[in-house]
Amino acid sequence: FVDCDYAIRECMKNTLVVVVDTHRPNFTECPQLLEISDKVVVIDHHRRGVDFINDTVLLFHEIYVSSTCEMVTELVQYIEDDVRINKLTAEGLLAGISLDTKNFAFKTGVRTFEAASYLKKSGADTIEVKKLFNSDIKDFITKAEIIQNAKVINNNICLAYTKTETDNINIVIAQAADELLNIKEVEASFVLARKDDRVFISARSLGDRKS
C-alpha cells in the first residue's frame, strides 16, 4: 500500500482511480485523487447518500448484493473468460464476503454463493480466510472492553465505546458491533472509538433496520 502523499505525486489526469466499498468522496483514503484523475470508477453496495462521486467513467452500484467483494468477483468472473486470480486475491475477496454477510447469515443470495464457489475454485482456503480475522491480544482485550461497556437502550439498540486507541481500531469496533448483535433482542448496535482526533462509528443491524 502507498500513502496519500505518494498517490497524489503519482496520479495523473489519465490515471485510472478505482473506488470500492464507498461512493462518498470524504470516505475515501485520499479524496484529492478524485480531483486529479478524469478516469474514476466506483464499485459500491451501500445505499446512496447525499454526497456522491460524480463524473465517473464507470459506476457499478447495487444495494441488494452482499458486499463489494461479491461485485468485484462477478466482474472478474464474467467480463473475460481467461481472467485468473491468484490464491491470495481469492482469499481476500472471500474474506470480504464473509465479513459483510456475517459468515453467510445476512444479505446472502444466490449470487453470493456463486461468487464464493468461484473463489473456492480459484484456490481460496477457508482456514486461511479465518486466520485473516484473527486478532492480536491487544485488539482482543479492546474488543472485550467494548462489550463490557455496552448498554442497551429502547430494549433493542446496543451502544458501546472504547477510549483505547489501536492501529486497527476501525476493524476492532466493526467486530465488536457484530458481536453485540448476538445479545438477545438486540436488533442494532453502534460502537464508537477515537483515533488521531477522529471519531469512528461502526453500526450494524439485523434485517429489519438499516445500518
Please tell me what each predicted stretch does.
Residues 5-8, 29-32, 59-62, 83, ...:
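A generic local secondary-structure boundary/capping motif
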Residues 45-116:
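Short alpha-helices
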Residues 32-37, 115-118:
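Catalytic-core regions built around general acid/base machinery
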Residues 1-35:
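N-terminal small/polar loop signature for handling phosphorylated ligands or for N-terminal nucleophile
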Residues 1, 8-15, 94, 102-211:
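Hydrophobic helix-and-loop "lid/oligomerization" segment in the mid-to-C-terminal part
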Residues 27-29, 51, 106-107, 170:
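Short helix/loop capping segments that flank catalytic or ligand/cofactor-binding pockets
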Residues 25, 48, 182:
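Residues immediately C-terminal
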Residues 16-18, 39-43, 58-61, 158, ...:
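Hydrophobic/aromatic beta-strand patches that form the interior of the parallel beta-sheet core
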